[in-house]
């Protein structure tokens, strides 16, 4: 719980510093439009839908003391997620101007669309890093390790804070974008020592496309993915609508959403993750008896 509170306080500080540095100028609107797309990529491919399907399947193998199968599944998902996110990010970077003009910000002026496309290419480094980090988070939670995954979002905000304070004065909004990339890397690195310390950890170079456990993850993921897609499409629609409004409208919308969801993350998400993993642990203990 404390780690979640720290994360949200750090996120609030980040939001204040960003608004202080950029106000509601067009450059920040461009950054927010670009980040909407990278958030969409991560959420659809490696976000909560995947975690909610992967963790129960992975935990079931742990309950049966079948760590070989558990890590084979984890390896397959790590490889598959990285492959999909890297290819998608590469293609998105190549067609960034078209994405911005036709999908993300059709009502921006041409110079602002160009800035958005450039920022998008920088931010596209982050989804693959977040994808790997998100899987680390699920694996650690399945092993009853909660502190480091809960601290990871704080490190992401910290990276953005460093970008605002030290890069933005000389690089402008590009400093904020590179700060976001740094934050994604810190999000991964803070979990890495705990991940490497897990027992019987074994990585294999396989995609496992025909394996029953991976197919089970896909089946569990499908209905959740539909819900995530609806939410993310709503964000994209809001972004498109905001780009046709006065300068700063998109920034105001994003800031308001961040403040509104803060209590949910601090209280509901922290309790839900802890209770979910405790329930799975209790189930494993009953099976052993």
Positions of predicted regions on the chain:
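Membrane-embedded alpha-helical bundles of multi-pass transporters/translocases
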Residues: 1-289
